[in-house]
């Protein structure tokens, strides 16, 4: 059985998908862009602003599921440029404590809405 998780504190999905799905002991959070829910626009045009907002969106969705960032066991980060890797790592690291989630990071040709970063997460209940 699966349950749709939706937070009004994170942006609506921009396509035919849910913000998150909970099933059994796992919560799968869809990729989050750095979109500010109050404006529907990117929080900023820079990697720092977009990464921070992406993480805040994940945090809000997890909170709706009754979880915190300490429940995250795996993330995937998609970057427009791996040149932003160090900046993203600094921000990302501030949201977690050891043991850190497993993670994969990829550079991609293009992201939705020409975003600089997209982050998805898997959490355990």
From Swiss-Prot:
One of its GO terms (cellular component) is cytosol. One of its GO terms (molecular function) is deaminase activity. PROSITE patterns: UPF0076. Belongs to the RutC family. PANTHER family: 2-IMINOBUTANOATE/2-IMINOPROPANOATE DEAMINASE RIDA, 2-IMINOBUTANOATE_2-IMINOPROPANOATE DEAMINASE. NCBIfam families: Rid family detoxifying hydrolase. This is RutC family protein HP_0944. It comes from Helicobacter pylori (strain ATCC 700392 / 26695) (Campylobacter pylori). The lineage of its organism: Bacteria, Pseudomonadati, Campylobacterota, Epsilonproteobacteria, Campylobacterales.
């Amino acid at each position: 059985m699966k349950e749709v998780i939706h937070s009004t504190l994170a942006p609506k999905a921009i396509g035919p998908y849910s913000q998150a799905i909970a099933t059994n002991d796992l919560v799968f959070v869809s990729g989050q862009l750095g979109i500010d829910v109050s404006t529907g626009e990117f929080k900023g045009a820079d990697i720092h602003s977009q990464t921070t907002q992406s993480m805040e969106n994940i945090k809000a969705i997890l909170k709706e599921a009754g979880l915190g960032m300490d429940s995250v066991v795996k993330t995937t980060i998609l970057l427009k440029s791996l040149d932003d890797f160090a900046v993203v790592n600094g921000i990302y690291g501030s949201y977690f404590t050891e043991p850190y989630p497993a993670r994969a990071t990829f550079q991609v040709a293009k992201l939705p809405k020409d975003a600089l970063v997209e982050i998805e997460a898997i959490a355990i209940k």
